Amino acid sequence: MKLFHILAFSGLLLFSANDSFAQKRTYECNPINPEYQAMADNVVKFAMEDPDAAEKAYTKLTKKIGKSTDDLLSVGTYFLEQNYIQGAMMYSKMLYEKAPEDINVLMYCGEVRMKMQDWGNAGQMFDAVLSYDPNNVEALKRNAFVYKNVNPHVAIDALQKIKELDPTYFKADKDLGDIHYKLDKYKDAVGYYENYYKAVPKDTINLDIRSCENFLQSLYSQANFDRMLEVSKEVLPLAPKDMVLLRMDFFAKVNKMGEALDYDGAVKAATDAAAYIYNNEFADSLYLYLDYEYAAVLEKEKGNIPAAISFYEKALAKDSSKLSGYKELSALYARNKQAALGIKTFNTYLEKLGDKADLSDRFLLATKYMAAYQQEDTPEAEKAEYYQKAGEIFREVIEKKPDYVQAYIFLARLSNVDSSKPLVEVRDLYKKVLEVSEPNKEKFENYRFEACRYIFFYDVSIEPADIEDAKKICEIAKSIRPDDDFVKNAETYLKQMAQ
């Protein structure tokens, strides 16, 4: 047998460094015989240096032990605790053949396979223990760990049983929270994490920071921003450079700005929390689309449109599939008097939207062209193109949906190229606004009032003035805003004309 020669090529196969589950002894085992310990130390020593010597030392030790189950278990445990996984595995096979119903042997065999990350066989060993002793808490704990990534429902059952047997074992709630988090059952995860968080001491030794990350992200999914802030305030001092904790604290503070009594203070708190983004405290690859989107939202709230644009550009560079980002960026470009970029970005949004684009999207595109046309620094040649494009799309929308009130109002505004004189085309469009908005007067009352103002101006400006229509329009306007100066002035004018 040249097993040592084969495995010596890879230290990872000889010595385990798997600390995914902090292993402590979960079974009864006699102290190792000092003579056997010295011989075992030789096996471990030679394993990486001299495979032939290691094999001889191993054979000598095993012969010396003979058939004693207790000594095989104590030496195997010594190998396991020295992270000499090959020796531990070989002893586990011998022990399982000798005593397949011994709970201590089964627990040992399960521990060895856990070290090897052989989760399936580890689970079988712990299942065997539970078939003999259903209330074996240590086997239940190991089973929960083994199965939580491969068969979470088995793990959940084990953890619930542990809670029944040992209500003080708060780690069961942590594990239940982790499992439900991975199953995207965030509401359930929050409940378990709350139980864990209330019970665990808040220090770096006892508190599991990764589970706190999951706890905060579960709270975020439930929009529980108040609780997020409470938790992050306690946990961040324990892990001040944890990116997930910083992220969740920042997101919560941005979401709380709108309802803060001290708005300026809330904005400052959010700005301070965004330092991990502003100061590039982490490698760029670690930032998410949402990091930059939230930073953009914050800068937009502060009125810093160029900075908001920059962050949205970074966000979309991270994830170009986020369609809402293109839509928002397009609007920001327009606000920043970069109408051409706004149009280009919105067209990208429409291309990515594909068949899901609807008339409202086409309408918004027309408003982008209209904004570009109205932008003062747009070259005249481009103005003409933008004017034509906007008009074409507004008319296209109206043709497909004749009761699209907003399309009429915007086309009327676009067509009002000379505000000093009445234009019949504009009057007709505003008449359509009143007509198509009739079924929803309250919803469109601002548009209706705007239409009344123009139509009244038209009626009294033409020769001869259309006083009868002007009276009707004045009454409509009065029904919307009876105390408005326009209504009062219109009534005064009509009275004078009647004299």
Task: Name each model-derived stretch.
Residues 43-44, 77, 111, 145, ...:
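Residue-level recognition of tetratricopeptide repeat
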Residues 2-9, 20-93, 97-104, 124-127, ...:
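N-terminal leader/linker segments that initiate helical-solenoid repeat arrays
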